[in-house]
Amino acid sequence: MSSPKPSLSYRDAGVDIDAGDALVDRIKPLAKRTMRPEVLGGIGGFGALFELSKKYREPVLVSGTDGVGTKLKLAFQLNRHDTVGQDLVAMSVNDILVQGAEPLFFLDYFACGKLDVDTAAAVVSGIARGCELSGCALIGGETAEMHGMYPDGEYDLAGFAVGAVEKSEIIDGSRIVPGDVVLGLASSGAHSNGYSLIRKIIDLAKPDLDADFHGRPLRDVILEPTRLYVKPMLGLMQAIPGVVKGMAHITGGGLLENVPRILADGLAARLDVSSWTLPPLFQWLRDAGNVDAQEMYRVFNCGVGMVVIVSAAQAGAAVQNLEAAGEIVYRLGRIESRAEGAAQTTVG
């Protein structure tokens, strides 16, 4: 007589439902801290409900999605998981801010091969912190435990932000003209871009990541989370309506490829390299990797995380407002007419 077949469970297949439930319990108080009055219900429903405020006359929804890229590989290597969540939020909310949108809510996707509740909770704590700093609600997400899809200890992240802007106040760069001033808001570090090159440089240079680097361990400088520009920029736009003619979030492609995205074909941005100092991290990356200057400006933010274009007449007031909000602001250059075939953004 044959022996009875064993009774299999989802856990036998590599999926721990109890761990998922435990994570949800850890997430709920984190998400609660981010709630806005417009949120209807809490975490755990099939869908998240958000009531659009009546303060908008002609609201236009603005959405964005992004990830953290290979910065995650360094987080795995250094066993540091509490900062990449803020990166995830910043990459999307800074993007939708560019069009003048106020971020309203955020959802995340966390995928792994084997769910480690402590690791996932650390990631979500960073997501919640990013939502708090940008004033948007963490209203939902998905945790996908997929045995065999990812190596143990590794995971991937995606984030989704939705915001709103008055139709008449959409910022699309159409009001930019020659003579306008290009301002730059300081970045906190490499943010979430260029990490494939950063990892290559680390592999070749083999620095001591625990060594002091200008007062902090190098590992902390490299993993410094992306700066959130939402509250200072929304404050500026509220204080001086119409002051912002265009914005560019300096992400993949650096200054050279992101600023042109908001310029008409006949315009160019001329940025003065002497208007700001290359931060120590980027100096080290340049020297350790022997990276060409133009490649630096095409890969990294080089210390400028957000570009803001304003009229020359309002530049002083804009700088004063942003500095009062805690931002470091550089006068990077000006907008000029562009000759046919000329580059739309130069740094020199």
From Swiss-Prot:
Provide one Gene Ontology biological process annotation: 'de novo' IMP biosynthetic process
Record localization:
Cytoplasm
Q: What is this protein's name?
A: Phosphoribosylformylglycinamidine cyclo-ligase
Q: So what EC number does this one have?
A: 6.3.3.1
Reactions performed catalytically? 2-formamido-N(1)-(5-O-phospho-beta-D-ribosyl)acetamidine + ATP = 5-amino-1-(5-phospho-beta-D-ribosyl)imidazole + ADP + phosphate + H(+)
Keywords in alphabetical order, please. ATP-binding, Cytoplasm, Ligase, Nucleotide-binding, Purine biosynthesis
GO MF annotations in UniProt: ATP binding; phosphoribosylamine-glycine ligase activity; phosphoribosylformylglycinamidine cyclo-ligase activity
Q: What is its main location?
A: cytoplasm
Q: In which pathway does it act?
A: Purine metabolism; IMP biosynthesis via de novo pathway; 5-amino-1-(5-phospho-D-ribosyl)imidazole from N(2)-formyl-N(1)-(5-phospho-D-ribosyl)glycinamide: step 2/2
Point out the gene that encodes the protein: purM
Q: Organism source for this protein? A: Aromatoleum aromaticum (strain DSM 19018 / LMG 30748 / EbN1) (Azoarcus sp. (strain EbN1))
> What family name appears in the similarity comment?
Belongs to the AIR synthase family.
User: NCBIfam families, from UniProt?
Assistant: purM
Give the record's GO CC terms: cytosol
Q: Which ranges form a coiled coil?
A: none
Q: Which EC class does it fall in? A: ligase
